[in-house]
Amino acid sequence: MALARQVNKRVESREAFFSLEYAPPPSGKDKFKIANPLFIDVTWFERNDPGNLCVPNSSSSIAAICRELLAQPNVMLHLTCNGRTKVETMRYLRQALGKGIRNVLALRGDDVKGVEYTKENSFYATDLVQWARDIPEYKDELSVSVAGHPVGHPNCSSYSEHLQHLKTKVEAGADFVITQFFLEAEVFAQFKDDCRKIGINVPILPGILLFRSAVSLIRIAELSGVSIPSHIRKILEANKGNIAAVRNYALHHAYEMSRELLSKEITHGLHIYTMNQPESSGLLLRRLGLWQTVSVLEHQLLQGPLTKIVCKVIHVPVPKRTKVWDKRADYVAPYLTGKLPNGVRFTKCSHPVHVRFCSCFNGRSAALQRVSA
């Protein structure tokens, strides 16, 4: 099922959910296997050659890793279109689609230094949404989200102008909106109401920021055009230099704001800007009761039919086992040292013994059984 349909289904059923955003290179992403987010979001980091799959920590590489190694089907990749031609942007999009990524956050992106802008490389998020919708073979699979700014976009002349731009992106084919962070729950509530009044009826997910320090919050707020309320500034000033206290406050603030949004049913989904802080994000999700103890990998395996997999054991006579051969796999060492598991013994190469992997899930565990052929 396409991510857009899953989001709509959760909203219609009033079922709480969350998503996680990482900025390459992420840390502790494996810790979120058991959190079961609806989707994982990877930012487009221009300074790290984001579209190059040969760069281990590029945005595209991280998204592919989340998709393949974490068995997370819903991976969203940020994609910008400003400063490059349509052909270049579409190459990155098709590359992501080829890696199984079916979700993108369409963004214009910041101006790139040293780039001379012409009509061939100056585009907006609306253009990218339209390009994505023009790919016929992924029409029913591709989900496209766009960004919304609850206090208005810093490059727009007014708040109402931003709302009109957002409406244009939705009309171009965007499935849902993910907002920039905000610092008061009522700001998001008002933004959502204003969107509904002008006909923006797609789901709107609030962006919840877990800032790392007072300095980082001030910097991000300035870049985003977000005003920091006076009561928050006072708390940050009172704890100046105390990093632990500031992070604890950031967690408390995010919890109180999220709890209010969920309890009043202003939203049913939260988009967590993790700032690559798995511990803080995990604490927030636990306090909100959104942390699930079912692994993503197991959840996906149990959705389909269970299949038995049979493989034949490679038997190598003891005299022929050399150090070179031993290096082929770590599991050989116990057999050479005599430290064998109960019931396991050396056999001749002709012995009709196979190892059958039975996908017999009892709760959350699988069993390995040794049986005669």
Where do the model's predicted regions map?
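Generic structural signal for well-ordered alpha-helices
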Residues: 4, 31-32, 59-64, 90-94, ...
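Active-site glycine-rich loop that binds ribose-phosphate moieties when present
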Residues: 155-172
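Acidic (Asp/Glu)-rich catalytic clusters
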Residues: 8-13, 32-36, 60-72, 93-101, ...
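Active-site pocket-lining/capping segments in soluble small-molecule metabolic enzymes
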Residues: 8-10, 120-155, 197-262, 276-278, ...
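Active-site beta-loop-alpha junctions enriched in small/polar residues
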Residues: 21-27, 43-47, 78-84, 109-111, ...
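Glycine-rich anion/phosphate-binding loops
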Residues: 29, 81-97, 123
